[in-house]
Amino acid sequence: MNNITTLVFLFFISLSINAQKYLFQNPDLGFEERAKDLISRLTLDEKALLLCDQSEAIPRLGIKKFNWWSEALHGLANNDSVTVFPQPIGMAASFNDELVYKIFNAVSDEVRAKYHEHLRRGGENKRFLSLSVWTPNINIFRDPRWGRGQETYGEDPYLMTRMGVAVVKGLQGPDTSKYRKLYACAKHFAVHSGPEWKRHEININDVDPRDLYETYLPAFKALVKDANVREVMCAYHRLDDEPCCGNTRLLERILRDEWGFKYIVVSDCGAIADFYTNHKVSSDALHAASKAIISGTDLECYWNNYTYKNLPLAVKRNLIKEEDIDKSLMRVLMGRFELGEMDPDSIVPWSKIPVSIVNNKEHRELALEMARQSIVLLQNKNNILPLNKSSIKKIAVIGPNAIDSVMQWGNYNGKPIKTITTLEGIISKLSPDKVFYDKGCDLVEDKVTKSYIQQCEFESQKGFKATYWNTRDFSGDIVAVQYISHPIKLTTAGLHEFAPGVKLEGFSAKYQTEFVASKNEEIVFKCGATGFFELLVNGESLIKYENWRTLPSRIPFKVEAGKKYFIEIRYAQLYNWQANIEFDFGSEVDIDYSDLIKKLKDIDLVVFVGGLSGRLEGEEMPVSYPGFKGGDRTNIELPSVQRNLLKALKQAGKKIIFVNCSGSAIALTPETETCDAIIQAWYPGESGGLAIADVIFGDYNPSGKLPVTFYKSSDQLPDFENYSMKGRTYRYFNDALFPFGYGLSYTTFKIGEAKVDKTEINANEQLNISIPVTNMGKYKGAEVLQIYVKKVNDHDGPIKTLRDFKRIELEAGKSTVVQFTLNSNAFEFYDWNSGKMMITSGDYEIFYGNSSRKEDLKALRIKIN
């Protein structure tokens, strides 16, 4: 029996040895040794391929295809049936980094589970379903006009740092593990925050060293040194004349030499091509690739036509050395080994996470809890909130965001199994017969479209003829034909087919009809799509694009009475993008608020759910409505159509609870007059509607605090393209409508006099602070205690700057003492003499309270020797 056992053991050892033909395939060796061995076996062309974010397979060595690009901004993006948490700007309002950690631990569970399930079903590593997630975005939200500020954790470097570190630790897993759970990515390095429409060409050269080291770099430094983030993404723009992805000051002297970063630098997508196409600092792709690799950019992201495929030619022409490529390749390959991607799933613990964990009950509860904690109560006149359910006979829910589930998902989002809208949340608290709903108006447009689709006809059928092919180029057999007599709105979200027999991926469609105009007029086509989209009228192309997001387009078109118009839409699903298409056309008529007011004659209380959406603000978007440009905003006021409707409701004597959904600050000065209560709900994720209803009806006491300044008007803002911090954020501006750190509660907290263990310390000492807090009200609630520091007589420094915070919960009538420990770095500021961040001797003011507003703060003073 023992002989048989020995033979079996030797047999399996033999199999293992045969399977491990090369040293790099041996999981018992260190990652560096394995990477060196693999590099020694690669050709120069193969090395270049492995430095592209879509790394092709190398079959002769058993190297599988690998994609570096996935997104997990607030859940696994571009995937169905995942948990969609609130947008990061909303999470920042919770001031709860412990909850943020739990959320991103859940997100990394879902990524791993979906990834391995996909492989088990025979799939391959693909874009948007991989082990490298380009999250978090830790750029400072310095200006509310920036469309991507919603992806960040606000305007303050310390808050950004606390939240960003929690994100990375949740995504990457414990440092004690042999294999990383995922690779997280700190982006966009550095000094990056719009304008979106100019990001490929702008040269930012007005950032003084103080702003650089006190504002723009701290979060990146912390994620590198404290969270061991494994990837850093360099940005599109130029900083002081050099593109960020070719900027040796940023990538070598600061990132690697000062901070000791030893992992992967990845370019933003297409940023290296910008060297020669937009920035004009390189003559062509060959020289751009050479500049980037020498400057320290290891991995190139691009849609196609990678500049890094020119690296072998660059070596042959002596522009770079092969050792330069090997240096970057070592970092990239060690990443793949550390993720366990080169090893069998059987020895990678993270591969055991079951797919049943995706959007499970625990994750849904986390999404709901974060949505609740993210809500900020900005105004509550005469304590109109919370509403008493039993006393409500009828309530109106009005507004363009009341039933918009897609708005709640924000951007860089996945698709949940179920989304609870605000209307649904309110109905769940009352009953359908007590709730009246009307959209009221659109987000921006002050006109409504009277659809003409019913007036169209094709092949003796009303509306559009829809023809489908299971190819992307309208070729092959037709697999389905339908007739659509209503506005087109189709999606594959939730695994829905466009038509029976049409695949979820790799299909194309044509929608055709004829329209005879009844009069001379200007009509408008309204459309949006993810994928390839083209609209033709009488064979003339009116709009044509490829896009990975569904964004609204409005195309005016003049028609003549009696003339026939052949309308054709060509659509194709592309890449692994989810398929979406929306289309309508007709005449526009002015909104008549009087009709709505008549419908509300017996209703006194209105919940208006408005604001913005990810279709208006976001990343480099072809949006050109008044007040919006290229994903950014040109003013920060509430769109006039919503403002006018709120005025009409006020003039009709209605009590108004305004729920503002946006990823950025809105100047709500007029709304403080027209509205009785204002709730800032951000883009609250899949359970956002229930969280909003919980707050409105008092089932949850709001505790969120603003992570950004809400200005009074656009007139208070400096030039968008000026990156100086002067006049920006609470640190250099103090005339806000609603200040950073502000947020009301249904209870009242009394903050007592703080005690410090010392009033004089040395530069390397800690300072301990004790602050008594009492809940003076009738409700259990949570409060966020905030600590700010200012260097006395620092005339060009910040008014104050956040250095610590704690979120506490207290029952009504209860008290506690909150303990803070300020480490020495809390007193670091930029020193012009040394050119470094350092602690200098002198007096320091410490402010403490529940917002950054002067009247909400108390002060004490200490001295540092």
Name each model feature, range by range:
Residues 1-22, 346:
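Bacterial Sec-dependent N-terminal signal peptides
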Residues 20-830, 838-854, 863:
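Glycoside hydrolase catalytic-domain context in secreted enzymes
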Residues 858:
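Short, structured beta-strand-loop surface elements
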